[in-house]
Every structure is written in C-alpha cells, then in structure tokens.
Amino acid sequence: MKDGIIQPWLNYDSMLVYSMNFLKRCELLDTPDGPKPAYLVTSKFNEDGTYPEGRNRNNQGGNAYFGMKLFRYYYPYFGDIDALRPVRDLLDRMAYFLTPDDWAWPGMVRTQDNDNPDGIYLDERIETDKAAMAAIAYFDYAEFTGEQKYKALAEHISSLLLACTGEGDAENSPLPFRINMRTGEVEEYYSSDMIFVVELYDKLLGMDTSLDKADIKAKRDLVLKWIKDYPMRNSLWSGYFEDVELALNNVNQFAPMETARYFLNNPSANPELEQDVLDLLAFVKGRFGGTVRFGGTSICEQDVCFIEMSSHTARYASVLARWAALTGNQAAKDEALATFALAEYSAYNKYSKGDVAINSTGLGYPKCWFSDSYFDYLPHYFEGMAAWPEMIPEGSDHIFSTTCMLKDVAYAPGNVKYSAMEPEGTERIKLSFTPKVLSGGKELPKSMWSFGKWRDCEGILTINRKGIKDIEIIKK
C-alpha cells in the first residue's frame, strides 16, 4: 500500500514467468487416446492444482486465440521460445478433430468440448466468434513458424464464416452465434462479440489469400457497421461465454472491452475513438465495477455470474491504460495501475510452490480456469506495460512493444538481439544500460532510434526500423 493505493504484491515479471511455468509444466490427464496436457482436456481445476474426477466443458478455441496473443507478447519480452508449446498443442488438437466432409460445415475445427468433456473433440455446435478467434490464432502461428498448413486451415475457416455473414439487426448478429455444423441449423441468432470477425477479416485483407478480397471488405464493413449501429447504441453486449445457454439479455463485460481494444488498435476504424472507448469503459465500470479496493476497480464477469474475477479486472485495466496513454488522462492512468495491482492478488495462490504459480480466478473465487487464470489473464499485463513501462521492474531489459512479430530474440547482460519479420517497424525496449544500436555489425543511424524518457519512464529505447530486420543492442 502506498498513500492508500494498492501496489503489486509480486513484481510482474515474476508473476508472468511463474504463470507461464504452470502452462509449460502442465499436468497430463488421461484421455481415450492417451495422456494430454490438462488444458486440452478440461477448462477448470481446483485451487490446490488438482483436477476433479469430472471434467469441465472446455473452451479451446478462445484459449488458442489468447494463448497465441500471449506468446506474441511473452516471447519478445523474455526470449522464451518454449512459451509457444501450449499454443501448438491447442491448435494441433483442434486440427486433429475436424468435422466430416459430409457435414454442412465440413473440415471445421471444434472450438468447444461441451458434450462430453474428455479431450476428444466431437461437438456438433460451433460458436462463430470462437471460430474467428481460432482462425486468427492459426494465421498468426503460421506467420511465426512458416508452416503453411495452418494458414490453409485458417483460410478454410474464414471461407465458412464469410459464407454465413449477412445483414444483422437488433435481434440477429451478422453471423449467428451458435450453429449446428452437421445440419447447418442455427441454434442461437445473436452475439455482440462480432469484433473478432472484424479482426479476422482485417487480417485477410492484409495478406495474400485465395479468398475474394472484395467480398471480405464488404462483409468486414457490414459487421463493423452492425457493431456501431446496435450494441454500441443499445448496450446489448450479450453472447460470448460457452457455458451460458440462450440468454439474450445476459450482458457481459468481455464484448464491450474487446471492442474498445479493437478501436484502440485500429484508430482509423472509428473517428469517435476517444469518446466511444470512454463510453465503453464507463458502461463496464458502471455495470460490473461497483467494488473499488484501494484505488483499483474490481470487475465482475457477466450478469448471470456476477463475481469479481481477475482476468476481467485486468482486461478493464488494460483498456483503461491504453485510453489513458491516448488521452493523457492522469486519473485514468492511476486507476489502471491500481487495478492491475488489484488483479494480481489472485495470482500465485497459497498452494503455489517455487517458480510455478497456481492462479485463482479472483479474490473471492478460489478455483482456477485455464482461460481466466492464464490464457485470458496474462496478456492484459503486457498491454499495460506497453502503455506504461513503469510497470516493468527496474534493472531489467525487455522488449515490451512491437509492431510486428520478432524472431531469434536473445538476451544477455548488456546485450539484446532480435530479428523482425517485417523490414519496417517500431520496437520499444526498456534497458538497464546506455545502448549502442547495431544492424549487420554497423551502427544504426541515429535518425532511426532514440533513448531516454518515454511516458514517465526513463531508460526507454525506441527503434524505428526502415529497410532492416536484424537488430543488436549492446552496452555503450
């Protein structure tokens, strides 16, 4: 506590590493085709790290999306390539259980394991927002690894989603929420969580693809317009969580916050960016954030599960931190930093040992979920650090912000190396030493980099690459 404001109880680097260690060393559970990491088999486990006899319905599609997002932050920040393994496990497991060729949706991944959770994915139902999230994860994984089979699967998923994208209205989203993949029958018509469809179509428009880009652009614009015309106006932010059935009026915080994040990432998509994000933040805080603890706002999940959870608290903090950086609003920054600190108090619970963190779901929710405790929890801290690097521990060296994927990241005392996957881009690195910046053994022109204070934090190196990919930073 400092001046009545909550502070992190564990430095964020340690929390992130210990949490990733839990995923990398995840216990194997028996399935009908052999032992598999628990995150492929169930979504939930006990606060002491044990697994109940009955498996909980799984949400592998969403976990794959957030797992890949986590890797995109974690790898540049720590240089740990092993953090990719849980993502590969999730993507390969989904790809192993594609739907039969004679189904209405052939060759489709199963993004949930609800019918008989056991690690064997045989569900007939798809949720279209999760399909979009899975496709994004496959595209990003293919980009990083160069393995084109993952891109081909992502394009196939995208083609099926494009085929069912149409006009929406107040009771029908542009893509139905839930569809029976065997029959093609629509089971639920409405989900406000359409922003991942927009993100997927954006990705397709920015790459080489065999799909019709005119069709993609038209449908991308249609979905984005629907979001602005309906949930942005009527606040009917329902339809995301896999374990909630037929609940049109069950509002959640997830969809408005992820929509706000999209607007922050894509300012050209919304001329009213500052006000719209502020309105979404105010809506979520007003409906789900009634509890304030020592300056930090604690966020509940949804109307039918009105419980404070750290993943959603950290999600709110990450969007608020980004908005504060955009606008220069000091009060918003202070609230965001306190909210991040509050959300950390469920990490590394009393059953954790050594360098492995068992993370409870929230302060009053001791059980653990792979989504809420790990995959959809940890990435929000990296977004906070990208906005406000003072969250990064002093005396450490970290690449905390990039505009493209990086490879061959390596850290040594007084030395940082990496290769960017695109010839132009910007990286920001917090350093414990005064740097000299090289590319190909030659000093980088001073016009391409600067070192000093950035957003209230000293020791920040900003590199604006033009026509180069390989960077080495050495102590001056």
Name each region found by the language model.
Residues 142, 147-230:
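Solenoidal tandem-repeat scaffolds enriched in leucines and small polar residues
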